[in-house]
Amino acid sequence: MNQNKPTSKLISDFWKGKTSEELFERAKKVSPGGVHSPVRSFRSVGGTPVFFASAKGATLTDISGKEYIDYCLSFGPLILGHRDPEIEEVVRETTEIAWSFGAAEPYSLELAELISSRVPWAEKVRFVNSGTEAVMSALRVARAATGREKILKFDGCYHGHLDSLLVKAGSGLAGESSSDSAGISATSIANTLVLPLDDEASVERVFETEGKNIAALIIEPLPANYGLLIQRKEFLLKIVETARKYGTLVVFDEVISGFRVGFQGMSGLLGIWPDLVTYGKIIGGGFPVGCYAGKKDLLDLVAPSGPVYQAGTLSANPFGMRAGLATLKKAQRDSIYSVLDDRTKIFTDTMTKLLNKKSNQEWEAVIHSSLFWFRKKTQQPIRRIDLIPEGHKESFAKVFHTFLKNGIYLAPSGYEVGFLSWAHDDEIIAKTLEIADKALKTF
């Protein structure tokens, strides 16, 4: 019996005998673009999105029963893989405890205490329902704490879809920004400054003119939403030093990197303590979650302790809290991080050799811990989005569809990173490379 196969007729009868093409056409009639997050539409790579029915370990199964080895992993939350047996048991227990309280409960307390005890800059923690919500709330705290209005962000870092941060660098004066989406008013982005990554001089210039007005500098210390743009530690140290010189709070967005690159995230690896930090993905064990954390005096500004209002009906829901707690405990107990790092290097080294043997361009893998990004080889590291090679999107799309056809699922965009999980053991990796070797013969 296929352990991925759903057993409920209420679920399976809906799509029984249907194809992904058929369901996608139906979906487009009732949902924008047929999906509920744009990248899922395959717009970046072309073709029809695969409709998946179930998942287990490192494997996805589509509605036709075809299996794929998954290197997207829901864009990062599933560090243990799909339905890890221990986490699955916790979730099953939770269905018999409560689905939602909307009240005080012990499960969020235990998870918050674990995070706070292991992450020294997270003196207090507030759980929310998404990374976007976490960032929105953290910046509200920063504005309240400083009495300032402006936020400084960096081109190539993604912080969710809130209006004030869905912006890109504009032309003209340093820091000027322009909307990255329709429907965002000019007033929403008037207080957002945007600079290129890897440019300390630009940061210093903006602070010289705007420093007294900037409430927070926000950055992904490991930018992983527009490729994997690994930053120099010297750059990060310098911008943090500059921000603090002007009384600006430092916010690290670790929604992707938190508990992925190590238990203390990039902040721990770098030895740089932010004033506020946002987490998500892994801390929910695969369920919707986000949190913002930081110094006690800053978090005590949040209601009901202080004047900064933030609330949520399903915040700290028991599924996310218990699954997240179990995930973090297992990650600690089994010391998964160094093993995942080694597996990722083995996987990407061999995959790069296969790509270079079969392709008309030279590829390389950019890796950090268990994150990876395949792109055209360049002479210098790529730390800014304007340096991503031309034609990358098209080159990746060809690789994506070659792998997809043969049962390897990558994130459906050349600008999304890939992930390994604890379920990607030596056998799964070897199987992936064997499939890739055969698939690339027709590349």
Curated annotation (Swiss-Prot):
| Gene Ontology terms, MF aspect | glutamate-1-semialdehyde 2,1-aminomutase activity; pyridoxal phosphate binding; transaminase activity
Gene Ontology terms, cellular component aspect? cytoplasm
The reply on keyword Cytoplasm is yes
* Full protein name: Glutamate-1-semialdehyde 2,1-aminomutase
- Which cysteines pair up through disulfides? They are none
The pathway noted for it is: Porphyrin-containing compound metabolism; protoporphyrin-IX biosynthesis; 5-aminolevulinate from L-glutamyl-tRNA(Glu): step 2/2
Give the species this sequence originates from: Leptospira interrogans serogroup Icterohaemorrhagiae serovar copenhageni (strain Fiocruz L1-130)
Q: What keywords are annotated for this sequence in UniProt?
A: Cytoplasm, Isomerase, Porphyrin biosynthesis, Pyridoxal phosphate
EC number(s) of the enzyme? 5.4.3.8
Q: Where in the cell is it found?
A: Cytoplasm
Q: Which residues cross the membrane?
A: none
Q: Which cofactor does it need?
A: pyridoxal 5'-phosphate
Gene name as annotated? hemL
Instruction: Name the enzyme group at the top EC level.
Output: isomerase
